[in-house]
Every structure is written in structure tokens, then in C-alpha cells.
Amino acid sequence: MVQVSFEDFFKVPDLKFDISRLRKDLEVILEKKNFNSLGISHFGAIPINRIPNDNDSVEGHNVRGKYWTIADETGKVVSRDIAIDESKYTELMPEFENTYFKEVYETLKSKFKLGRVRLLLKEPRSTLSWHKDPEPRLHIPIITNKGCSMAVSYTHLRAHETSID
């Protein structure tokens, strides 16, 4: 068996989140909101924050935003979608008030410069192709299937075995 090293990953001391509470409050959110798929197969997002008083900032392609990918057999990296000024996303969406998501958001905001924060859905037996985001990302698996993994800088992380503590 191959031994995986996570020495190149940054861990924040004393940063812990309760995944059970996130799951419980996810159910509350899903009673109020649906995942926006943008018509893209196996993709869905629910924005957690927005540009203050700007509902357009969480609509259409503002839900996804710019990224780079290898689109074809040439291997050339190309830009996709629209550029977004993530630093403007500072207001928590009203439906996340009085949830554990707000506590997580406020904790992260006190330690890091945040941009857009979203709940993302990847349906079972679906994948994302290689891509690069314009900013660093933090991914917290809330619900995942055994065998689910994420490759970050050629290192594979098993989502169901990771924890935030």
C-alpha cells in the first residue's frame, strides 16, 4: 500500500468544526434552498455569502466563477467562466443566520481573508476534471461516500477519512 504524506498541507492549530452539526443544519438549509445547477451536470451550489445587498452576486455564473482547465487533447490550459472579485463577498446570506454555518463562517473570517463561501454538491459517481482556482480554497466534506477522494497538487485525500480536527 502506498503511504500518503500530507506534510505540504497547511493545518491551522486549534481549528475544529463539528461535522454532525453541519449535517444537521444542512438539512435546515435544504428545506429553504435548492442547489443551483446552472444547467451543469452533476454540479450544484448554494451561496453562503454575497456582496452586501447584491442578490445578483449569487446568481448565474457568479455562483461558479473563473477557473482554468485543460479543455482538450492539446494540453493547453485555458480560462473558463467570468472573473469575480471575491473580496467583496462579505455578507452572510439571511438563511444561514442562526445556523452552525454562521459560526463556522465567523470563525474562518476571524482567521483568514475570505472570498465566496458556498455549499457545493457533487453527485455520486461524478467527478470534476483537473482545474485551478484563482484563489486558495478550503474544502470541508459534510456528506460524502466511501471511496470519494480529492487530488490537490497531485496528492490524493480520502474525503470520508479526513477530519477538520
State the predicted function of each range.
Residues 133-147:
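Short, conserved beta-strand element in jelly-roll/cupin
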Residues 114:
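Acidic-glycine-rich active-site phosphate/pyrophosphate-binding loop
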Residues 1-104:
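Non-heme Fe(II)/2-oxoglutarate
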